[in-house]
């Protein structure tokens, strides 16, 4: 009986000892994990904030780098365009200088009209000493790059009379005036009408084609198929006027 009481006493003492040993650790564990958890959360939040901050800064730096790159590209393009513009203008300047030098060298020899042609203002004249019909005379002038004489003013008429007659006076010369039918109006080759005081003298011709010629300071009408000398007119070289 005494041994059983001792055994029973031992059995009750063991649980009491284990409980007294476990309780301190159980009371300490929750507080430590809370601190660790809080610290971990703070670290995570800090890392997340740092990551977001660095991401924003990286994006800003990347945008700035791209802007700088685009600006450099634009500047390079503008520099290339400026260089090309300068090169072109340099070439143009050299070309102008060369043209000016050629003009200065040839200025003393510049003649506004071909050899043997007579100049009056912006026109050159030449009296051909071969006979042609009016139409053939017109074609011959076209081959020379000009047209039959067209008299637009009394002053031009006076010049022609004074100049041409000194060389070949007394001849009949076709000019570029014709009549539109036996009783029609008179026209120059360019379609304009002669001045009223420069109309050819009407000879009451019955020919189907009537043209005008110059003789003794007067315009006279005649059959276009008759043969006469003719006078051509062309524009003077503009650079020599």
Swiss-Prot record:
Record-given protein name: C-type lectin domain family 9 member A
Transmembrane segments: 35-55
UniProt-listed SMART domains: CLECT
Keyword Signal: no
Native source species: Rattus norvegicus (Rat)
Keyword Disulfide bond listed: yes
Subunit text: Homodimer.
Cysteine disulfide partners in this protein: 113-124, 141-232, 211-224
Chain ranges on the Extracellular side, renumbered to this chain: 56-241
Primary location recorded for the protein, binned into one broad class: membrane
Alphabetized Pfam families for the sequence: Lectin_C (PF00059)
Gene Ontology cellular component annotations, sorted alphabetically: cell surface; membrane
Tissues in which the protein is found: High expression in the spleen, moderate to low levels in several other tissues and cell types, but no detectable expression in skin dendritic cells or CD4(+) T-cells.
Sequence motif ITAM-like, location on chain: 5-10
Subcellular location: Membrane
GO terms classed as biological process: positive regulation of cytokine production; receptor-mediated endocytosis
Cytoplasmic-facing ranges: 1-34
């Amino acid at each position: 009986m005494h041994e059983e009481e001792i055994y029973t006493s031992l059995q009750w003492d063991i649980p009491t000892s284990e409980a007294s040993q476990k309780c301190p650790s159980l009371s300490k564990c929750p507080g430590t994990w809370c601190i660790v958890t809080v610290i971990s959360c703070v670290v995570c939040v800090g890392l997340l904030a740092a990551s977001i901050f660095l991401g924003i800064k990286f994006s800003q730096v990347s945008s700035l780098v791209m802007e700088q790159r685009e600006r450099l590209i634009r500047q390079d393009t503008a520099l290339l365009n400026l260089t090309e513009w300068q090169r072109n203008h340099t070439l143009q300047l050299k070309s102008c200088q060369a043209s000016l030098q050629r003009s200065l060298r040839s200025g003393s020899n510049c003649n506004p009209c071909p050899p043997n042609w007579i100049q009056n203002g912006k026109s050159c004249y030449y009296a051909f000493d071969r006979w042609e019909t009016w139409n053939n005379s017109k074609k011959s002038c076209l081959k020379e790059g000009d047209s039959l004489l067209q008299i637009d003013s009394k002053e031009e008429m006076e010049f022609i009379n004074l100049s041409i007659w000194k060389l070949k006076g007394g001849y009949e010369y076709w000019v570029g005036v014709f009549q539109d039918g036996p009783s029609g109006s008179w026209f120059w080759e360019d379609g304009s009408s002669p001045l009223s005081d420069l109309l050819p003298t009407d000879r009451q011709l019955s020919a189907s084609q009537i043209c005008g010629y110059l003789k003794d300071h007067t315009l006279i009408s005649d059959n276009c198929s008759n043969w006469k000398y003719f006078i051509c007119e062309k524009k003077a070289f503009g650079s020599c006027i």
